[in-house]
Amino acid sequence: MIILEILLWIVIVLVAFRILIGIVRKLIHFPAPAFISIFLDSKARGWWQPPKDIIRFSNIKKGMKILEIGSGSGFFTIPAAKVLGYDGEIAALDIQQEMLDKITKKLEKEENSGIENIRCVKASAYEIPYPAETFDVVFTVSVLQEIPKPHDVLLEAHRVLKKGGTMSISEFIPDPDWPLPSTVEKQLTAAGFKNLKKHGNFFRYTITGVK
């Protein structure tokens, strides 16, 4: 009985914390700090947001040129790079140099030796430094809603995507900025994306749209 009470209180505290953080994030927009990468790179995240699922749902395939908006420390970047192979390329875009430095450090590890198709790009998602119709896929994971003007970001993503290219947005409910799937669908539609598809479930999903 005592154990159940403790577990209940833990759940209550976690829910309250998530609500509090969510309120703060609505009032003050800020990117996830670099130190949080210890959680973003955890094995637990590999269970609830498996990179292989994100890659599959996002239609990422060998030889493509793709862009990740808000790459963070590269939790999805490196697995995607391995799928792309030597003929493909991924641009890892993040506004924080500290996060991009973490990707560079990971690439020095033996298990990532030979990966040479990642380009780290420090830039704002409002002004993606690439010409129109550059990428086959643009994807973002638990990032879009923490940006003050997500519509502007999606318009930029639409610009740099090739015709017929895929825009992919993945979300998971523990994230304080988690949106309803219907919210993401409306955002994609408003930015000009069509043929929307939802993968996963209500709590953990990927929604894709086509340019």
Regions found by a protein language model. Give the residues of each.
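Conserved Class I S-adenosyl-L-methionine
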Residues: 179-199
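A short glycine-rich, Lys/Arg-flanked "PGG" loop and its adjoining helix->strand segment in the class I
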Residues: 151-163
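A short acidic, Gly/Pro-enriched loop at the edge of an enzyme's catalytic core
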Residues: 126-137
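Class I SAM-dependent transferase core
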Residues: 4-64
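Core SAM-dependent methyltransferase catalytic element
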Residues: 191-192, 200-211
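Conserved beta-strand signature within the Rossmann-like core of class I S-adenosyl-L-methionine
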Residues: 164-171
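Class I SAM-dependent methyltransferase SAM/SAH-binding core
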Residues: 67-69, 73-127
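A short SAM/SAH-binding and catalytic strip from SAM-dependent methyltransferases
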Residues: 136-149
